[in-house]
Design a protein with these regions (language model features):
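Class I S-adenosyl-L-methionine-dependent methyltransferase catalytic core
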Residues: 1-156, 160-386
């Protein structure tokens, strides 16, 4: 369900999803609590943001002085570039402003800037935002927005799901600090995983209980259980914050049981009662299907779900690679990929996935039945605890 929901998100007319204020506040406070000076005298750029509607703009404007910001810049796409089905209706905020231009309102993006006490009330807040039309349509790849990127210290936003790879590359190219929202499956993208493996990007503090709620003009296109008609929000579970800003949760080591204790007492039926952990047919590693089943005393390589990264502590584990693209040192590979025999056994056992010989997916035999492990990350303890 989660994957199909995000597919709908990618296919939505403009990937227009608005993050909840409390989720933004919870995330940003995690960085500020870990390092109270992290945002002091810094410039934050929020591209792809629709400042008139965005809770990102609202949060940072309201907390401008508390965070000690130097400057806040927020930009939006031109309505024409979003391919609205219905005629675009500008806000009263825009139409009541002397600089309102009916043509530019649909053809040009907008930029909002906060850096001074415009109202003269002795504080800098949301009432001091100043705006004007951009020269172009607000696409982050334009020279106009790229120059703003180069000026900024931080890039913070919820980019269109469909453009996540390209947007991240745009940030990384300028070596900026960032906090952005994306699909958790992006972890194993070949353009993304090396950043995680090399400790240049990690997961943020996270959404409450792992549930991300968004408002969107297309909410009713989602099924019951995803769209809540009472709140008008859609819920995605497979969404997370990606960042390169440090936070305290990242340095909390997992409390784990030994391998023997897991095999005897695990709450998971896939582990409890077994004589040993399953081993992959094509990787020199054991299959660990749950993060809380990682054995504390195993000094070899382990394959874990991508959700492990939400609990990853860099002082506790080393990330070695991923099965999704076979991005791992050859010394950990038993074969170049899935063997022809394993693939045949998989289909003989009733497997329905699409696999062929040489595929990097991690495969293993469970009670002599060939199984495929979905998107595994290979890890190893930095030091073993008995």
């Amino acid at each position: 369900m989660a994957n199909s929901n995000l597919t709908n998100a990618r296919n939505a007319k403009n990937d227009e999803f608005y993050t909840q204020y409390q989720d933004i506040e919870k995330e940003i406070l995690a960085y500020a609590e870990y390092n109270p000076e992290v945002f002091r005298d810094k410039t934050i750029l929020m591209p792809c943001d629709d400042p008139e509607w965005s809770n990102f703009t609202k949060y940072f404007a309201q907390n401008f002085e508390r965070l000690g910001l130097k400057k806040l810049i927020s930009t939006s796409y031109a309505p024409d570039s979003k391919n609205y089905k219905n005629k675009y209706q500008p806000t009263l905020f825009e139409t009541n402003d002397p600089q309102f231009d009916e043509n530019k309102s649909v053809k040009n993006g907008k930029i909002f800037i906060l850096e001074r006490d415009k109202t003269g009330d002795g504080k800098i807040d949301v009432n001091d935002l100043e705006w004007h039309y951009l020269e172009g349509d607000g696409d982050y790849r334009s020279k106009e927005i790229t120059s703003l990127r180069d000026e900024a210290d931080f890039i913070i936003t919820n980019p269109p799901f469909s453009l996540f790879r390209d947007f991240l590359a745009w940030i990384v190219a300028a070596d900026k600090q960032f906090v952005i929202i994306g699909n958790m499956n992006a972890i194993t993208y070949k353009e993304v995983f090396p950043l995680i493996k090399n400790d240049k990007m990690w997961l943020g503090n996270g959404f409450h209980a792992g549930n991300a709620y968004f408002s969107t003009p297309f909410a009713k296109e989602y099924a019951d259980g995803v769209y809540n008609s009472e709140t008008g929000l859609v819920k995605f579970r497979n969404v997370c914050w990606f960042t390169n800003i440090d936070h305290g949760r990242r340095h909390r080591p997992l409390t784990l049981m030994t391998m023997d204790a897991n095999l005897r007492f695990s709450k998971h039926k896939e582990i409890k009662g077994k004589t040993e952990y399953d081993r992959y047919d094509n990787y020199d590693a054991i299959e660990v299907p749950f993060t809380d089943s990682i054995p504390s005393d195993y000094d070899g390589v382990m394959g874990v779900p991508i959700s492990f990264l939400d609990k990853y502590c860099p002082e506790q584990f080393e990330i070695l690679g991923t099965s999704d693209n076979g991005i791992i040192d050859d010394k950990y590979k038993l074969t170049p990929g899935l063997t022809n025999k394993f693939v045949e056994d998989y289909y003989k056992s009733g497997g329905t996935g699409s696999y062929k010989e040489g595929n990097p997916t991690a495969g293993y035999y469970q009670d002599q039945v060939a199984k495929m492990a979905y998107k595994r990350i290979f890890i190893k303890h930095k030091s073993v605890t008995i």
